Amino acid sequence: MLSDIDICRSTPLKNISEVAKQAGLHHNEHQPLGQYKSKVSLTSLERLASQQDGKLVVVTAITPTPLGEGKTVTTIGLAQGLAKINQSAMACIRQPSMGPVFGVKGGAAGGGYSQVAPMEQLNLHLTGDIHAVTVAHNLASAAIDARLYHEQREGLEAFEARSGLKALDIDPRRIVWRRVLDHNDRALRMITVGKNEADKTINGFEREDGFDISAASELMAILALTDDLQDLRKRIGRVVLAYNNQGLPLTADDFNVAGAMTVTMKDSIEPTLMQTLEGVPTLIHAGPFANIAHGNSSIIADKIALKLSDFVVTEGGFGSDMGFEKACNIKVKASNKKPDCAVIVATLRGLKANSGLYDLRPGTPLPDSIFNDDQDALIAGFENLKWHINNVKQYQVPTVVAINRFPQDSAQELNALKQMITDFDPSVSVEVSEAFGQGGEGATQLAHAVVKACQKQSEFKPLYHSEQSLEEKLMAVAEVGYGAASISLSPLAKKQLAEFKLHGYSDLSVCLAKTPLSISTEAHIKGAPSQFDVPVRELKLCAGAGFIYALCGNVMTMPGLPDKPAFMSLDIDSKGNIVGLS
């Protein structure tokens, strides 16, 4: 079989203006950027306001291997499958971060014959939205250190007299806004800024700082959760950057930088229209990770797509304990749009990996033996799929299981897995998806199952409500969302929680950051663990995004590169063609 990039290059694509017309957009509602991508104006929503919304289908998965189990392949393949059975469909996915593209996972455009195209444009820069988020974020960092420098150098009274501004009296030990970069670079996790020659302060005042990956920026979460430009401006204004020496929060509005940050991001609020290999319109927008952020594409993209099509297929990152949980408890609260159907992606290799009989690690290839018939491993790993089915069903959303077939999978094991699912829960539809190898044609049975599931009434139920305390919300996600026995807060987390309550942030949602490779907070614990503790080492306030962010276990907000990163395979030929991107 051809590589992903070769399949993409050998497939004729439509001009993006034709794709936009097919989607139902007027020519003045999008701005083409080249032949194959276009920015979609929010003015389209004004014209479409009276249109009835389509059905929202959220694709999630079992606990994945480090290489993923094909959620994006299934998302794109399902949208193509729906089009094959004459349903009006669009897909909405996140913009890939270049950190994973150059790191372990590679690209995030789907794969095989279920890709967003051109895949190299999607995976590398696209329309620069992540760059805009990075620049806006680091503008705030520059504003903080500049203000700290001038206030400390002159003294507060002299600063006020000279500048006409009110001194913020920043506590340099409590600057909570770290810098960001769209790369995996562990060396930048802890740094010192403002270093000077002896007895000089020209470079600012020395303090500890660090970098997160851009996908973990609160601005990325805001971009995914906002619904218009005015709301974007308000949310950015509420972002807490630091605290003063009286312990009060200082926001982007306090630093008078929120307006400039919003200006920097004004074009990034528009989703990017692209197409699948079969010409299905696809909106790309925002890119928060699901392990260290809320992990879903944007509300704006969903709103536009839901007005233009009968079925919108989107995805939440990693397993249902990660992106799907956050879709239900964070995204739905902001959008007020509940999912009509959930699709759980499972694979034979992923279930065997969850058996505990294989030692799989990020950055190392999967052993060939994982594709051999192994009933014991499949039965043991099936506990993980059972857990995810029960987890999704507790939100009372109609559920379909899609078994994503790899070329090495045996028909005997696929049939055995289908029967195991039916025996476990006859109410859950299950179909084998061959979207990777066959495109939409390989996902038509899955598409029929999704259409049927969407005809059922979704009695959506979140895990918690705004009026509950922050402790109750954290416990709800840990104990009900993960099946944990308890949650334990470090002394620092307890102190932060009390402070957030004092400053009036108790109504916010909670976003738990943990490993995606286990339902627990320990990556090596596979299957369907129970009776474990969720240790919260630190809490971060995302007042603009609307959630409290809990760092659990040893999760990092700046990834590192493996010993053999994906960038080693990337190159370019004499004609400008990129090679080695997958």
Swiss-Prot record:
It catalyses: (6S)-5,6,7,8-tetrahydrofolate + formate + ATP = (6R)-10-formyltetrahydrofolate + ADP + phosphate. Pathway: One-carbon metabolism; tetrahydrofolate interconversion. GO terms for molecular function: ATP binding; formate-tetrahydrofolate ligase activity. ATP binds at residues 65-72. It is an enzyme of class 6 (ligase). Keywords: ATP-binding, Ligase, Nucleotide-binding, One-carbon metabolism. Pfam families: FTHFS (PF01268). GO terms for biological process: tetrahydrofolate interconversion. Belongs to the formate--tetrahydrofolate ligase family. This is Formate--tetrahydrofolate ligase. It comes from Vibrio atlanticus (strain LGP32).
